[in-house]
Amino acid sequence: MAKLHDYYKSSVVAELTKEFSYTSVMQVPRVEKITLNMGVGEAINDKKLLENAAADMAIISGQKPLITKARKSVAGFKIREGYPIGCKVTLRGERMWEFLERLISIALPRVRDFRGVSAKSFDGRGNYSMGVREQIIFPEIDYDKVDRVRGLDITITTSANTDAEGRALLAAFNFPFRK
């Protein structure tokens, strides 16, 4: 079991129950899933770019990504409906906890000029979204084998009802919010 999951069960649940005065342990917010998304717009011209992006995402997440396709044709972007334009992975359970642990303790501190992540990126329902400009902040990615530096979107979906609860949950995991 991931250390972060143990820490959640032993410390965070009690801490949040006390802070928000929940009557049941089931009311305490928990991380439900983490979604990683990588849009590869250049894949229209070169299919190899999408394969490389999917391989990078598989290394980062430990799971084979789903290739996302364009929902409708857009002449301005020169894409047609059904064209593969990105990839995504949904992490749950053990892999989710391991990824969150690596993100907080290893990957985010490796970002250049890192001063913390914005605390304003909550969606109003306690879910947190952030973008990473370079996939090379993850230690699993070999810098010499990267063909192009790509960014990815990370969405942390929680069972929290409000942004305050979601922020308290992530702050309890020592999530590096900007002061």
From Swiss-Prot:
What NCBIfam families does this protein map onto?
PRK00010.1
Which cysteines does the record link by disulfide bonds? Answer: none
Concerning PROSITE patterns, the annotation shows: RIBOSOMAL_L5 (PS00358)
What is its biological role? This is one of the proteins that bind and probably mediate the attachment of the 5S RNA into the large ribosomal subunit, where it forms part of the central protuberance. In the 70S ribosome it contacts protein S13 of the 30S subunit (bridge B1b), connecting the 2 subunits; this bridge is implicated in subunit movement. Contacts the P site tRNA; the 5S rRNA and some of its associated proteins might help stabilize positioning of ribosome-bound tRNAs.
Where would one find the signal peptide in this protein? none
Q: Which Gene3D superfamilies match?
A: 3.30.1440.10
- Which InterPro entries does the UniProt entry name for this protein? Ribosomal_uL5, Ribosomal_uL5_bac-type, Ribosomal_uL5_C, Ribosomal_uL5_CS, Ribosomal_uL5_dom_sf, Ribosomal_uL5_N
How it assembles, according to the record, is: Part of the 50S ribosomal subunit; part of the 5S rRNA/L5/L18/L25 subcomplex. Contacts the 5S rRNA and the P site tRNA. Forms a bridge to the 30S subunit in the 70S ribosome.
Q: Which GO terms describe its cellular component?
A: ribonucleoprotein complex; ribosome
The record, for PANTHER family, names: 60S RIBOSOMAL PROTEIN L11-RELATED
Top-rank taxon: Bacteria
A Gene Ontology molecular-function term?
Answer: tRNA binding
Q: Which family does it belong to?
A: Belongs to the universal ribosomal protein uL5 family.
In its UniProt record, which GO terms are filed under biological process? translation
- The name of this protein is Large ribosomal subunit protein uL5
Key words, A-Z: Ribonucleoprotein, Ribosomal protein, RNA-binding, rRNA-binding, tRNA-binding
This protein's species is Aliivibrio fischeri (strain MJ11)
